[in-house]
């Protein structure tokens, strides 16, 4: 891989400095909001395959047969040693992502009609209103671009680690019609839909 290859992967947009490439930003989400982000990924991927979330340090499993915004059945935080721990709904987790992706996460509330809620915050839990204030900078004051972060990571390895030759299992599709799986970990919207279906069948 060359620097130009890495640039082509993440070459869109520009930051506050006007130079090519979206910069990385640092924001904080609650565990509940992370789970909602996974739901967005699982529900939207089938409709827009190009619009996917890939998260380092997290894993989630979804069932495509479940209802919209209720497709994720399991999720966890993956620690550096490879072990998985449950995600705490109330804890704040640091998320580093591109400026564009961060801005799009903030639109989920409206796009999901309030079913899902993702509100990026600062480390103290205050709602972010200007994402450019949370851009990550190099020691020399320049923005850390998405493409540059990727190029630097590839360069640090010398030869690309063989584990990248195949998916790491961070996003797992588990298609099943098993009733227990279809009802597992439903959110409020899911249970209301189930209740409505039961009432219709009982009428």
What are these regions (language model features)?
Residues 1-203:
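Catalytic centers of hydrolytic enzymes
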